Regions:
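The serine-hydrolase catalytic nucleophile loop
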Residues: 40-51
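Conserved alpha/beta-hydrolase
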Residues: 50, 54-72
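Short beta-strand/loop motif that positions the catalytic acidic residue
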Residues: 190, 196-198, 202
Length: 269
């Protein structure tokens, strides 16, 4: 990873669990899955999914988006192009050792994978909690608000404080808005098979815009799944009541498109 994308002496990684990770397949290799975490999170967020995918026969690698896993001050100075570059480099690294690479991302991580897929041709995309609009009505104005208020404070459960930021940089939300403008333009160009998942209980993003994203996707085939109000934004968490069903959806999608690529019959999760 280039020096400008990595941690620095000023902003070191504050917890080893926030480091990027790469795990080989526990069974004969069925391909690889690139995992991309969300805004103000860290690779730790993707570990539960990563372990399940590894045990199912997939090599997995999770990137750390620049400015994440260090400090909110570090994130404040970052641009979405740096995040996207980290995703591109992770994808290209997996490509060198695997016959096919899937992408699985949550929230902003899902948007970054969509931007990647407009340039590359992954074997498939799994987009968890994607969106074209954030829920907060002031989110579109963050380009100006960043000069008035630097951070938005939120409440975190104590056990999550090492892995997520309590303070969200408003400048970072502005970067998400910039990324959204790009993704909106590029969605029709994406052709990789896609699974898109949202939940009615999501209080972070505009859920209807997730469906709109799905409809604009040029992917063929593509599938959309909407969970109910009991399920929230953090679909990568085993604490979600939909977790067993979500794992089944993900594995079925991967195995089907893995079989499509190789000519083998898809196995049942």
């Amino acid at each position: 990873m280039p020096e400008n994308l990595g941690p620095t002496a000023e902003f070191p990684i504050r917890n080893e669990a926030n480091q990027p990770f790469s795990w080989p397949a526990a069974q004969p290799d069925q391909g690889a899955v690139l995992l991309v975490h969300g805004f103000t999170a860290s690779p730790w967020e993707m570990r539960p999914l990563g372990r399940i995918l590894q045990q199912a026969g997939y090599a997995v690698a999770a990137v750390r988006l620049p400015g994440h896993g260090t400090s909110h001050e570090d994130l404040r100075r970052r641009h979405y192009e740096e995040w996207l570059q980290a995703v591109i480099e992770g994808y290209e690294l997996l490509q060198t050792g695997h016959r096919q690479v899937f992408g699985l991302g949550i929230s902003t991580g899902a948007l970054l994978l969509a931007a990647l897929a407009a340039q590359q041709q992954p074997a498939g995309l799994i987009l968890l909690s994607p969106f074209l609009r954030l829920r907060h009505w002031l989110a579109p104005a963050c380009g100006l608000l960043q000069y008035v208020q630097a951070y938005q404070e939120r409440t975190l459960r104590p056990e999550l404080i090492p892995y997520y930021y309590r303070y969200r940089p408003v400048a970072g939300v502005h970067q998400i808005n910039r990324l959204l403008r790009r993704v909106r333009r590029e969605l029709p160009q994406i052709t990789a098979p896609a699974l898109v998942v949202n939940a009615l209980g999501d209080r972070t993003v505009n859920v209807a815009s997730g469906r709109h994203l799905f409809e604009r996707l040029g992917s063929r085939p593509k599938a959309y799944h909407l969970y109910g109000p009991e399920v929230g934004h953090g679909l990568a968490s085993p604490d979600q009541p939909c977790w067993p069903d979500l794992i089944s959806l993900v594995l079925t999608f991967l195995r089907h498109h893995d079989a499509t690529e190789t000519g083998r019959s898809p196995s049942v999760p």
